[in-house]
Each structure stands twice: as structure tokens, then as C-alpha cells.
């Protein structure tokens, strides 16, 4: 039982680290894209609308990246034995749900898209993130069950 618990803890630490870096990479990639490639707007769009749209987009990407980092840090902490609330698993579930939707939309775009290689690479990256989020969810639930079972065995009854 202890070996299984250790393996799950290591998996949580590893996948949590992966999600943290995925969140950081998402923000860095987005920022570099804006800096080096700029943002395309319709010619009729006013400068104020362009600025507002850019700011809202930056804030949204920053929030999403922060959520990935939050889930990653929480998974690492749980893997290291710290008690974490269920909130990070709920956030992880929402991120996973939206990532699955994005993968489906990318698959549809693959049918009608022009830049097929870019779409395929993006799908692979998003699928990898979805696997990491799934692993965090599964391993966290397993670890909580093992720890709960251990507490019950130590006390002799369920609290």
C-alpha cells in the first residue's frame, strides 16, 4: 500500500509541475505572439475597441494561465502530503472540460482549415494538457481514498 501511495504522490508532483509549466508557457507564448506578430483587426475597428479587446484578451489568458498554475501547485502540494481543498479539483475539472471542447473544435477546424500542420500540433499540445489534467484528477482521488483508508485503519472506525 505504501509503494502505491508513494507512486501516486510522485505522479501528482510530476503532473502538477507539468500543468504549472503549461500555464506559464501559454502566457509566454501568447505574450510573444502579440509582441512579434501583433494582432489583426478589421480595418473598420476603432483604436479604442482594439485596445479594449487586446486588454480583455490579455487578462483572460493571464487568468487561464494562473488557473493552470494554481491547479499545478495544488497537485504538487497534495503529492507532498499537504491537505488541499477540493476546489482545485473543481477548477481542474472545468479546465479539462473546456480543453476537451477545444480539442473537438480543433478537430472540426482540421476538416475545414488551411494550415493543417498548425492545427495538428495544437491538438497534440491540447491533448497532452488534457491527459495531465486527467492524471491529476485520477491520482488525487486515489490518494485521498488511500489516506482516508489509512486514517480509518489507524483509528479503527470512520470519523
What is the role of each PLM region?
Residues 15-23, 98, 102-146:
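Alpha-helical membrane-associated segments of multi-pass integral membrane proteins
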Residues 67-99, 103:
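Loop-to-transmembrane helix junctions at the membrane interface
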Residues 7, 45, 83-87, 113-120:
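Alpha-helical rod/repeat scaffolding segments in eukaryotic adaptors/tethers
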Residues 40-61, 120-124:
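Transmembrane alpha-helix entry/boundary detector in multi-pass membrane proteins
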Amino acid at each position: 500500500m505504501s509503494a502505491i501511495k508513494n507512486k501516486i504522490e510522485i505522479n501528482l508532483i510530476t503532473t502538477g509541475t507539468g500543468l504549472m509549466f503549461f500555464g506559464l508557457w501559454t502566457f509566454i507564448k501568447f505574450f510573444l505572439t502579440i509582441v512579434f506578430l501583433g494582432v489583426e483587426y478589421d480595418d473598420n475597428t476603432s483604436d479604442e475597441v482594439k485596445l479594449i479587446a487586446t486588454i480583455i484578451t490579455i487578462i483572460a489568458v493571464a487568468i487561464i494561465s494562473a488557473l493552470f498554475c494554481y491547479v499545478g501547485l495544488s497537485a504538487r502540494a497534495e503529492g507532498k502530503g499537504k491537505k488541499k481543498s477540493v476546489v482545485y479539483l473543481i477548477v481542474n475539472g472545468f479546465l479539462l472540460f473546456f480543453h476537451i471542447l477545444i480539442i473537438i473544435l480543433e478537430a472540426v477546424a482540421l476538416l475545414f482549415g488551411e494550415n493543417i500542420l498548425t492545427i495538428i500540433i495544437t491538438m497534440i499540445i491540447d491533448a497532452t494538457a488534457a491527459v495531465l489534467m486527467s492524471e491529476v484528477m485520477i491520482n488525487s482521488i486515489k490518494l485521498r481514498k488511500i489516506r482516508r483508508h489509512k486514517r480509518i485503519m489507524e483509528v479503527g472506525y470512520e470519523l
